[in-house]
Structures are given as C-alpha cells and as structure tokens.
Amino acid sequence: MIKIYDTMTRSLRKFVPLTENTVNMYVCGPTVYNYIHIGNARSAVAFDTIRRYFEYTGYQVNYISNFTDIDDKIIKAATQAGVSPKELSDRFIAAFIEDTKALGVKPATQNPRVMDYIAEIISFVESLIEKDFAYEADGDVYFRVEKSEHYAKLANKTLSELEVGASGRTDAETALKENPLDFALWKSAKAGEVSWDSPWGFGRPGWHIECSVMATEILGDTIDIHGGGADLEFPHHTNEIAQSEAKTGKTFANYWMHNGFVTVDNEKMSKSLGNFVTVHDMLQTVDGQVLRFFLATQQYRKPINFTEKAIHDAEINLKYLKNTLQQPLTETADEQELKQFVIAFQDAMDDDFNTANGITVVFDMAKWINSGSYTEPVKSAFEKMLAVFGIIFEEEVLEVDIEALIAKRQEARANRDFATADAIRDQLAAQGIKLLDTKDGVRWLRD
C-alpha cells in the first residue's frame, strides 16, 4: 500500500486513485530559457522515479509535464540573443529532452507547451471573470485572492501573513489591483513583445494560469497527483489551486508532492546565487546514470548536498551494482530470502517513495547475490528494482561470448599455451572485462 506525504494536509496519506489502477499526474516542467542545472534535474529524476515505482506496482501512469515556452525570462533571454522567444524555447526544449534522456528519465505521456494553449487560456480567464473571481484593469486581468476561501492553505499561510511580491516577480501594476496580493491571469502586451489578441487587447498569459489550463485540459478537473519543486509551493501551486477550484468548483489535485532542493555548501543551488552546475556541462565528464544515482540517494523530499565526493561515491556504487548484475548465474537460491528482499524493497518505496531505504535493500540484495545466490528469478527481481531508479545497463559484450572465450583460455592454460591464454585475457580486457582467477574457478567483471 503506497503512502504519500501530501503537502496540503502535511500528513502521510494512503494513495487512492480516482480511477482504479491508473495514476494521473501533472509535474511542473522547466521554463525553457537556458540549460537546466542539477537542482532542476532533481525534480525530473524524482518524479520519474515515482512514476517508475507506480508502474513497478502495476499502475498505468499518465505523466504530464509541461514546457513554459513564453515568460518574462524567455523574452529577456531571446532579446539578448537576437532570436524570437519561440526559437529560444525550441532550442532549450531540445536541450532539456537530451539532458533528461541522458539521466534515464522516461518521456512524458505528454509535454504540453503554453503557446499551444492560448485559446484555452483565454477561455479559462473569461470563465473566471464571469464568476466574479477575476477582473480586467487596463488590459491586464487579475485574480481576486480574497474570494478564494482557503487561499494559501497549501503553503500553510493566511492572507494576512502574505507580503506583496512574494513570488519574487516585479509587480509594476500594483496600483491597478484591487488588492496588492491579486495575481495576473493575463498581461497586456508591451512594445515589441510577443502577444496574442484577446477580449482585453493584445497580451500573454500569466505564469500560474498556464499549468491550470494544461493540467485540466489533458487530465480533467481533478487529478490524482500534482508535483514540482518545493519552491513552487507558493505562489505558483497556491495560485493554481485558487484559480482552478474557482473555475470548476472541484478539488484540483488530491495529492500535492514537492521535492527538496539540491544544495551546495548547504545553500540552495540556483542561478540567482551563481552556485549552479548545468546538467549539459556535467555530462561532459560524468555519466548520466551516475548523476541520476546520486540524485536518488536521498528521499525525494529531503535536500541533497552536491559535492565531488558524492558524485565519486555514486560512480563507485553504480559500478558495484553493474558488476553484481554480471555475475554468472547459479543453479539455486533461497526463494524465501528472495521474497523477503522484494517485500523489504516494496515496504521502503511504499513509504512515500523512500529511495534511500530502497537503495539500502538493493545493496543488501547485491551482497547476497555476490555470495552465490543468483538464479534467473533473482536476476529478474534485481533488474526490476534497479529499473525503478532508472538504472538499466546495456550489455556491451554478450555473456555467452565471454564464457566461450574464458573456456578457450582455460583450455589453453591446461595445454600450457600461455601465450594464447594471455592474448584472450588481453582481448577481454580491451572490451572492459576483467578476469579473476579464484580457487573456485574464473570469475569475470565488467570494468
């Protein structure tokens, strides 16, 4: 039984889907004006792991993750680069797909883009105005937060506690608002900016409305899970809830999940602090699976500190798991012990997707395998566990070919043909295969 820590209730809750055996989840994707950094990648990897575990347990997952392809930052970066916002966003969408593929992130069921939903956004805003939850002011449209009965409950705040500009975005039109906390649903166009015609004149969507529209258009008025980074809890997800529930009168999401930050020297990794490393740059020297494994070593809600040592440790541990998978199969293994490993793994992951505990089980199982318990069922169970973490090794050299060469080497040694035996060892070494001569015979490892 999977239990999820729900940010809205600040409690661990049993997962009950809206539709049996199906999970509909929406995860906020990147604003595509630059390469993603390791902190951004944490969200992609964390929710991909969550998706994979749902699939491991038999669920069908509809996984939606958007691209914000029009935004103040995109407009600014495009202007500086001398290209259109679409050209810039297309470039970094392609980069995001390439980077996350290297991290073993499965393609989303759908990746909606804001520019493809302008008509639906306008219709959504019109509905909010009709219901008196929104108002037009000089070409802008704002949401009335005071009409939202439980505004900011997700962030465990009250209206009186909130400060103007909590989102960190410049609010030059405060004088136009009925309440300084009201947020933009539609922004009037500035000279030279990309814009679309609307009942309120030319303009473009506000940031928060975009995800509400794409999520409900694709998954319906109520979804099972909405996820994203902890920094989106307020104001982004708070505002999504307010406008979505104002329009539909229904609960927007049944479970809210937020991943913790990647830190550097215990400070949040961010572009504003200048302490970030892009995935694109890291992949020049570090294998994508190593980065992914590093990000999985902590439970998704907890912060994880980025250090060279942590990356090095991930590389060593990943190599150990790879070598474990490549052990020769044995004829027997304790089926009851295998069952206990599977149960322990599921218990760990059922507890709010605790990857740290899940990985501990994986290493305990690897130790058991290396002690001589590696039948086909054991291998299958082990591979399925690793796949939850996105760890899938490609076979560079087929086992049957390796075993055939080892047999030839053994025959050469028996005939005291050491030149041939050494040549076979060198041939295997060139293919990344290391031979270990033991009293029980020859073992081999991928280097």
Swiss-Prot record:
Positions bound to Zn(2+): 28, 211, 236, 240
Gene3D superfamilies listed in its UniProt record: Anticodon-binding domain of a subclass of class I aminoacyl-tRNA synthetases, HUPs
A GO CC term assigned to this protein in UniProt: cytosol
Main location: cytoplasm
Transmembrane residue ranges: none
Major enzyme class: ligase
Localization per record: Cytoplasm
Record bears the keyword ATP-binding: yes
Binding site for ATP: 271
Keywords per UniProt: Aminoacyl-tRNA synthetase, ATP-binding, Cytoplasm, Ligase, Metal-binding, Nucleotide-binding, Protein biosynthesis, Zinc
Reactions performed catalytically: tRNA(Cys) + L-cysteine + ATP = L-cysteinyl-tRNA(Cys) + AMP + diphosphate
Motif 'HIGH' region: where in chain: 30-40
CC cofactor: Zn(2+)
Molecular function per GO: ATP binding; cysteine-tRNA ligase activity; zinc ion binding
EC number: 6.1.1.16
Cofactor note: Binds 1 zinc ion per subunit.
Motif 'KMSKS' region in this chain: 268-272
A GO BP annotation: cysteinyl-tRNA aminoacylation
Similarity-based family: Belongs to the class-I aminoacyl-tRNA synthetase family.
NCBIfam families (alphabetical): cysS
Subunit structure: Monomer.
PANTHER family in the record: CYSTEINE--TRNA LIGASE, CYTOPLASMIC, CYSTEINYL-TRNA SYNTHETASE
Protein known as: Cysteine--tRNA ligase
Originating species: Streptococcus pyogenes serotype M3 (strain ATCC BAA-595 / MGAS315)
